Regions:
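Signature of dsDNA virion morphogenesis modules
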Residues: 1-169, 179-180
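Noncatalytic, helix-rich "gating/capping" subdomain that lines the substrate-entry/channel surface
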Residues: 170-174
């Protein structure tokens, strides 16, 4: 089955930080795996069709907010059989991006989410969700859905978040509001 190209999808992944280079504001992370997400959707890493195209404009966004400036760029994208690894260089000129980088460096944030256009998908009737066998990457995003929602509360209370826009966004976010 071929899914319509005009329907961008988002697939969140709890993520795993593999390496942080504070001097370069660089984070190496697993941004997706073949494990099913909460809706039962699966991304096949080898199905990424446009890696070269994406790397010509390798934007990394905050929570898929296309109307905001990117918080960084992808310097390297590595496809393995069961996962996708990205090296994200956060913007040093943006206080917002600096705060997001600090949250990853301190282990407060670990989540990532890819925004993509499905090209070929197979529904999984028994399990729900779909297997995306071919897809085009639009962007990936740093997302504030850590495994422990209390981490956001601690980050704000400890003064680790300095950017006013990020503080405001977290304070207004539905999930954050539940723990603040």
């Amino acid at each position: 089955m071929t899914a319509p190209r005009a329907d961008p999808k988002i697939l969140a992944f709890p993520g795993q930080t593999l390496k942080v280079d504070e001097s370069k504001m660089l984070v190496r992370s697993i941004i997706s795996t073949t494990a099913p997400d909460r809706a039962g959707d699966v991304i096949v890493p080898a199905g990424l069709r446009n890696a070269d195209e994406y790397l010509r404009n390798p934007v990394v966004l905050w929570a898929h907010q296309r109307s905001l400036p990117p918080i960084g760029i992808c310097e390297r994208l590595t496809l393995e059989a069961d996962r996708i690894i990205a090296e994200t260089k956060f913007s040093a000129s943006s206080p917002f991006a600096q705060d997001v980088f600090k949250l990853y460096a301190e282990g407060v944030l670990r989540g990532w989410s890819i925004g993509f256009l499905p090209v070929q998908a197979t529904p999984q009737a028994a399990k729900g969700g779909s297997i995306y066998r071919e897809w085009d990457l639009l962007e990936y995003s740093a997302v504030p859905i850590p495994e422990n929602p209390q981490a956001l509360t601690l980050a704000i209370r400890k003064g680790m978040i300095h950017d006013a826009d990020l503080r405001h966004w977290l304070m207004c976010d539905v999930m954050a509001a539940l723990v603040l």
